[in-house]
């Protein structure tokens, strides 16, 4: 993959536009998000996560994060759910078990999220570029 450099590896098309992520950009997103989950949230290898972002390029990033970190993706009873702000609004569990990931086409963090929840799209920006 590294030989592809700036060539697109992920293309996401929706009614709001088209986003292409190069190998470099995709790897950077995975690295930052991996560091966030491991160092920021202190998730350990084999922890369980649910990626509930639907048809969005962020889904491919977070699935890549699970592979890079050794996390296990599950549908039921995860340690952490990665989901959109709209899902956080109706979340019945503890806010500590839900990370809000923006569904903005360009990945801009949501400006307002429910109290007590982690704004994952904002937090990942504070973590290193290499995992």
Annotate the PLM regions:
Residues 1-21, 125, 131:
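AMP-dependent adenylate-forming
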Residues 7, 44-46, 78, 95:
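A general structural motif
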Residues 11-13, 25-36:
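Conserved N-terminal alpha-helix of the aminotransferase class I/II PLP-enzyme fold
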Residues 14, 25-26, 51, 81:
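Acidic, surface-exposed loops and disordered segments
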Residues 18, 23, 55-57:
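Alpha-helical scaffold segments that form or flank carboxylate-/histidine-based iron centers
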Residues 36-71, 76:
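Conserved AMP-binding/adenylate-forming
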Residues 64, 68-131:
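Structural core segment of the AMP-binding/adenylate-forming
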